[in-house]
UniProtKB/Swiss-Prot annotation:
<keyword id="KW-1043">Host membrane</keyword>
<dbReference type="GO" id="GO:0033644">
    <property type="term" value="C:host cell membrane"/>
</dbReference>
<feature type="transmembrane region" description="Helical">
    <location>
        <begin position="146"/>
        <end position="166"/>
    </location>
</feature>
<dbReference type="GO" id="GO:0016020">
    <property type="term" value="C:membrane"/>
</dbReference>
<comment type="function">
    <text>Plays a role in virus cell tropism, and may be required for efficient virus replication in macrophages.</text>
</comment>
<protein>
    <recommendedName>
        <fullName>Protein MGF 110-1L</fullName>
    </recommendedName>
</protein>
<keyword id="KW-1133">Transmembrane helix</keyword>
<keyword id="KW-0732">Signal</keyword>
<keyword id="KW-0812">Transmembrane</keyword>
<comment type="similarity">
    <text>Belongs to the asfivirus MGF 110 family.</text>
</comment>
<dbReference type="InterPro" id="IPR004848">
    <property type="entry name" value="ASFV_fam_110"/>
</dbReference>
<feature type="signal peptide">
    <location>
        <begin position="1"/>
        <end position="26"/>
    </location>
</feature>
<dbReference type="Pfam" id="PF01639">
    <property type="entry name" value="v110"/>
</dbReference>
<feature type="topological domain" description="Extracellular">
    <location>
        <begin position="167"/>
        <end position="269"/>
    </location>
</feature>
<keyword id="KW-0472">Membrane</keyword>
<feature type="repeat" description="A">
    <location>
        <begin position="1"/>
        <end position="146"/>
    </location>
</feature>
<keyword id="KW-0677">Repeat</keyword>
Length: 269
């Protein structure tokens, strides 16, 4: 009984943490408080941008690079059920659908710290429950039974470490798919979901370019291998996942990329 009580107490904060968001009917007009969530994944959707005189600024991330309005910014609608979120790109037909799991990302700013905290608390809690159970058996069982329990506890320890703290497998990028470091800011402004824009460790991914960008959990939002191509006046990147999807933009966008301006000046000389 004591072990069950301890487990129940440990489960309460976990249930509170994973409390599901309220359902949201499909819409292209979002509550302002949810922009931070949706614009983390669907950054190219029009509801994330405030465009005036051809210059677009990100509504959710104020220090995000401004861009010129072009076909990168797509019309989108979003939908949320009890256990997952979906956003649709409606600018093209058939509409493209992308799915993310909502309960993991209720608040990005404290997500990483909280998830690690509760992982540790749950692990220690399981160990405590195991020790209490072993202590009860010590008084009632034989030495052989106790040894079996100790072996099971060790196996449980190893499995819990594997499940809670497993390291991500190193992803192999395709040859030529990773742009030079000096160009990451350009590519990750437009191809934000490309995996070369993210540093993922222990299931938590941080943006390499925008340091104040909220960390996100690794999911199929960033599973794309991307190819990048530089032309004289155009740039394009291709998402390579279930099928090829090419996006084209002008390389001079955003205009503050001085390295590109300098490069073009040298070519003109």
């Amino acid at each position: 009984m004591l072990g069950l009580q301890i487990f129940t107490l440990l489960s309460i904060p976990t249930l509170l943490y994973t409390y599901e968001l309220e359902p949201l009917e499909r819409t292209s007009t979002l509550p302002e408080k949810e922009l931070g969530y949706w614009c983390t994944y669907a950054n190219h959707c029009r509801f994330c941008w405030d465009c005036q005189d051809g210059i677009c600024r990100n509504k959710a991330f104020k220090n995000h690079s401004p861009i010129l309005e072009n076909d990168y910014i797509a019309n989108c609608s979003v939908y949320r059920s009890n256990n997952f979120c979906i956003y649709y790109i409606t600018s093209i037909k058939p509409h493209k659908m992308y799915r993310t799991e909502c309960p993991q990302y209720m608040s990005h700013e404290w997500h990483e710290a909280v998830i690690r905290k509760w992982q540790k608390l749950l692990t220690y809690g399981f160990y405590l429950v195991g020790c209490v159970l072993v202590a009860n058996y010590v008084r009632k069982r034989s030495l052989q039974t106790i040894m079996y329990l100790m072996v099971l506890l060790v196996i449980f320890f190893l499995l819990s470490q594997l499940m809670l703290y497993r390291e991500l497998e190193d992803k192999k990028h395709k040859i030529g798919s990773i742009p030079p470091e000096r160009e990451l800011e350009h590519w990750c402004t437009h191809g934000k979901y490309c995996n070369f824009c993210w540093d993922c460790q222990n299931g938590i991914c941080k943006n390499k370019v925008f340091k104040n960008h909220p960390p996100i959990g690794e999911n199929d939002f960033i599973r794309y291998d991307c190819w990048t191509t530089h032309l004289l006046n155009k740039c394009n990147y291709e998402k390579i996942y279930k099928h090829f999807d090419t996006h084209i933009m002008e390389c001079s966008q955003p205009t503050h990329f001085k390295w590109y301006d300098n490069l073009m000046k040298k070519q003109d000389m």
